Amino acid sequence: MFLLNASRLGAGSRLFSSAGVQFAKKRGQAAKEAVEVDLVDVGDYVKKATERFQHTVELHKKRLGQMKAGKPDATMFDGLAVGNEKQKFTELAATSVKGKNMLIVTVFDPKDTKRVASAIVGAGLNVTTERVLENQQQLKISLPPVTTETRERLCRDMKKVFEEYKNSANRHSLGHVRSEVLKELKKLDKKNDSVRKVIQEIENLHKEYTAMLQEQLKHAEKNAMR
């Protein structure tokens, strides 16, 4: 645990006189302007950063795991936002697997079917969407056949996901987390040894977790090309 003397009121004050620089105050002034000490556990910043970095790695792994070439996945639309209201897909519809390359989306309210279909088409997932004629609340989603081209496209999409979680405006990206933590640390006394050590530790953690993301991407790409 690192303890930082964050601020001292009255410390470092200078009194100039014809006799030179004086570093003492009268007892009455000293009592009035007592030193205020704030103890800050800067080591806690390491703990918080580690927790947030770990959460990012878990989200990245889950996201890559959902990206499977040609394999139907009932959760593939769960992250979509529907309409201008940006409603969660899961609040409006449910998805089930049918056969080797098909999904059935059941919309809870018929009036939302068109909006849900538009969200799926607009997501750029390279799927074919059509209404089930006998049921206006259902959409039939056909997945494309798996080819070398689709596998390579999947790998490119995975790389985009990697970049998003590595360094982007996404509040879960490693870069965003690093910037927020360092911003808070630099409000403290950067000349203090404890603060400098913690800043360096945050930088080292950032590098370690970036390497973890790279390993996850490498593993996902390998599976995609099989």
Curated annotation (Swiss-Prot):
The lineage of its organism: Eukaryota, Fungi, Dikarya, Ascomycota, Saccharomycotina. InterPro entries: Ribosome_recyc_fac (IPR002661), Ribosome_recyc_fac_dom (IPR023584), RRF_sf (IPR036191). It comes from Eremothecium gossypii (strain ATCC 10895 / CBS 109.51 / FGSC 9923 / NRRL Y-1056) (Yeast). Its main location: mitochondrion. Pfam families: RRF. GO terms for biological process: mitochondrial translation; translation. GO terms for molecular function: ribosomal large subunit binding. SUPFAM superfamilies: Ribosome recycling factor, RRF. GO terms for cellular component: mitochondrion. Belongs to the RRF family. This is Ribosome-recycling factor, mitochondrial. The keyword Protein biosynthesis applies. Necessary for protein synthesis in mitochondria. Functions as a ribosome recycling factor in mitochondria. The keyword Amino-acid biosynthesis does not apply. It is found in: Mitochondrion. Keywords: Mitochondrion, Protein biosynthesis, Transit peptide.
